[in-house]
Amino acid sequence: MVENVIWPAALDANRSRSDGRRVSLDLAVENPTVDEIAKAVQQVGYDAVIERDKTYPREYEGRGRVVVKDADDATKSDLLGAVAAYMQALRE
């Protein structure tokens, strides 16, 4: 069983690659929330668990994280790309 962790910083357009962004600026969104990420993960077809008490190491204030369960068939970068694309569609 593979668990992937998605931090909001990985999809944040306001962050640089060195600050933790994992997708291109074309796919990134501004200030993503864990609720939006979890909804996008579920729409992509995976189970998501929100952990609100977790803090990304490079952030002062904690925004939480989303744990993706049983994503054995996708790499983390594929998963992040699909989630980011769905989040962009949600915001339009």
UniProtKB/Swiss-Prot annotation:
It is found in: Cytoplasm. GO terms for biological process: SRP-dependent cotranslational protein targeting to membrane, signal sequence recognition. Keywords: Cytoplasm, Ribonucleoprotein, RNA-binding, Signal recognition particle. Pfam families: SRP19. GO terms for cellular component: signal recognition particle. InterPro entries: Signal_recog_particle_SRP19, SRP19, SRP19-like_sf, SRP19_arc-type. GO terms for molecular function: 7S RNA binding. The keyword Ribonucleoprotein applies. Involved in targeting and insertion of nascent membrane proteins into the cytoplasmic membrane. Binds directly to 7S RNA and mediates binding of the 54 kDa subunit of the SRP. Belongs to the SRP19 family. Part of the signal recognition particle protein translocation system, which is composed of SRP and FtsY. Archaeal SRP consists of a 7S RNA molecule of 300 nucleotides and two protein subunits: SRP54 and SRP19. This is Signal recognition particle 19 kDa protein.
